């Protein structure tokens, strides 16, 4: 799990280092309000790095939604620190009571092409910019 956390941390660093004008609006205030698209992009990245496919999980707590990756019991989240009650920038864990509070459900495989060609074009451009980030 240490290698998975390193990969997730690396991807987060790449997002942070990417010029904002190269990112869609949904990622320009990362991690705030970025969990949906960041989760799809991270799922794509981890699959390409050989970690297999993850599911996109979506949950609600107190009127706020949150998305993260999950494969079996393994949770991967690079945007949880957008919430005031969570400080860790990267979560890779077999269990997370914090995520349990969202009562998330698996929606679909986390890839940049799950929402059709238009979304794939936008997320694909962002993905290329992120991978080419100077950070």
Model-derived regions, located:
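A structural boundary/capping signal
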Residues: 1-135
């Amino acid at each position: 799990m240490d290698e998975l956390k390193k990969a997730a941390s690396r991807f987060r660093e790449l997002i942070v280092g990417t010029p904002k004008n190269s990112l869609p609006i949904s990622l320009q205030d990362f991690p705030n309000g970025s969990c949906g698209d960041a989760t799809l992009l991270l799922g794509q990245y981890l699959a390409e790095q050989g970690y297999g496919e993850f599911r996109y999980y979506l949950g609600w707590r107190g009127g706020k939604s949150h998305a993260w990756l999950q494969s079996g019991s393994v949770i991967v989240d690079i945007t949880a620190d957008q919430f005031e009650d969570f400080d860790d920038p990267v979560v890779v864990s077999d269990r997370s009571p914090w995520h349990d509070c969202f009562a998330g459900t698996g929606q679909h495989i986390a890839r940049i092409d799950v929402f059709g060609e238009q979304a794939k074009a936008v997320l694909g451009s962002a993905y290329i910019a992120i991978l080419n980030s100077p950070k």
